């Protein structure tokens, strides 16, 4: 018989740097999950990734206090900031530009994030990433 699901927890956890401090500790502690067990499992699963990269994580907590977790690719904004070599996007995207990214860079990011995007083909995924870049105040060049 399948385990009964008690709830889901969605967090953005830095790769290889999960520790029991907030926000991870309180979120898992409320559900009665063993925090250190999650931290060790998460850090082991993300040790090959760039340290500190934000990883969207969905933790499924079962009624017997056990859990499973699924990780997704980092947010598009993380990749775009890295490609444009900037610390943060523009606070007024329609008026000032924070930097530039090429369509080729958008395509690379779309290839990396394709499974997490709601797109049927790579061209649609590239357009989604280019739209994200524009909303961050980045200029998209051909």
From Swiss-Prot:
Gene Ontology CC terms, in alphabetical order: cytosolic large ribosomal subunit
Pfam families assigned to the protein according to its UniProt record, in alphabetical order: Ribosomal_L11 (PF00298), Ribosomal_L11_N (PF03946)
Listed InterPro entries: Ribosomal_uL11, Ribosomal_uL11_bac-typ, Ribosomal_uL11_C, Ribosomal_uL11_C_sf, Ribosomal_uL11_CS, Ribosomal_uL11_N, Ribosomal_uL11_N_sf
GO molecular function per UniProt: large ribosomal subunit rRNA binding; structural constituent of ribosome
GO BP of this protein: translation
Modification after translation: One or more lysine residues are methylated.
Keywords: Methylation, Ribonucleoprotein, Ribosomal protein, RNA-binding, rRNA-binding
Taxonomy, superkingdom: Bacteria
Function: Forms part of the ribosomal stalk which helps the ribosome interact with GTP-bound translation factors.
Family, as annotated: Belongs to the universal ribosomal protein uL11 family.
Subunit description: Part of the ribosomal stalk of the 50S ribosomal subunit. Interacts with L10 and the large rRNA to form the base of the stalk. L10 forms an elongated spine to which L12 dimers bind in a sequential fashion forming a multimeric L10(L12)X complex.
Protein name: Large ribosomal subunit protein uL11
Organism the protein comes from: Maricaulis maris (strain MCS10) (Caulobacter maris)
Gene: rplK
